[in-house]
């Protein structure tokens, strides 16, 4: 199965500069029309100010929290949607930048993340 990043613009970071103004990057991104199922969220989190507290949060369409992280660096989690829904990704505090965002179905992520040769190779047919 082909890997598809469902995040609309993976090379555009989410930034929270504390102004509350969308022109300065204070915004969240919604991924609409996700089917029910299990997904992987992975991203790089930087924080140029406070190094404590929640840096990133994921919400569903009812603003119910799905995930939050206080980590700096590469963050990865899985989450399950019980019904078709929307997921919002928000840089949660001033100074946070979220980049290299990947949101994809867990079944495609798991097979690709293992790396190595495709399953049709064996130890005798692999091109070492």
What residues fall within each predicted segment?
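Extracellular polysaccharide-targeting segments
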Residues: 1-18, 81-83, 90-128
């Amino acid at each position: 199965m082909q890997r598809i990043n469902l995040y609309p613009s993976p090379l555009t970071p989410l930034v929270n500069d504390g102004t509350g103004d969308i022109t300065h990057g204070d915004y969240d991104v919604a991924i609409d029309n996700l089917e029910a199922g299990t997904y992987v969220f992975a991203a790089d989190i930087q924080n140029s100010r406070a190094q404590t507290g929640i840096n990133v949060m994921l919400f569903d369409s009812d603003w119910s929290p799905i995930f939050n992280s206080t980590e700096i660096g590469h963050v990865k989690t899985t989450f399950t949607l019980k019904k078709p829904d929307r997921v919002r990704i928000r840089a949660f505090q001033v100074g946070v930048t979220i980049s290299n965002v990947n949101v994809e179905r867990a079944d495609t992520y798991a097979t690709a993340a293992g790396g190595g040769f495709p399953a049709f190779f064996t130890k005798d047919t692999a091109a070492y």
